[in-house]
A protein has these predicted regions:
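Sec-dependent N-terminal signal peptides
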Residues: 1-2
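Boundary at the C-terminal end of the N-terminal hydrophobic targeting segment
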Residues: 5-12
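Active-site metal-binding motif and surrounding structural segment of the metallo-beta-lactamase
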Residues: 47, 59-104
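Conserved beta-strand hairpin/beta-sheet module of binuclear metal-dependent hydrolase folds
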Residues: 16-74
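Intrinsically disordered, low-complexity N-terminal regions enriched in serine/proline/glycine
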Residues: 5, 30-31, 78
Length: 104
């Protein structure tokens, strides 16, 4: 018998329960809202919130939940800055656009 598995599936990279990290304040107005293997950062400004990267798929829920756990409202995410064009960093951007009106 031959078993072929996707290494990403085996590692739990797509599983929000495995990837969950308690969101935390890094310093001043910068917060971590990402997962264990891919980062997302939230910057609080006078103009609203700026999110750096949005994760993807179910992991985008980690970002949204983290924003709420820190006492912020995802509706206040005005801008999303994508650090680079890998799917794990950009996949949730459309969701933020559609649900919260964020500008990418």
């Amino acid at each position: 018998m031959v078993v072929v598995a996707n290494a990403q599936e085996l590692s739990g990279q797509d599983n929000p329960e495995v990837q969950r990290v308690e969101p935390f304040q890094v310093f001043d107005n910068l917060y971590y809202v990402g997962g264990k293997w891919v980062a997302a950062w939230l910057l609080e400004t006078d103009q609203g919130l700026i999110l750096f990267d949005s994760l993807y798929g179910d992991l985008t829920d980690l970002v949204i939940d983290g924003i709420r756990e820190l006492g912020f409202d995802p509706d206040d995410v005005r801008y999303i800055i994508i650090t680079h064009a890998h799917y794990d960093h950009i996949g949730g951007a459309r969701r933020f656009q559609e649900e919260f009106g964020s500008v990418v």
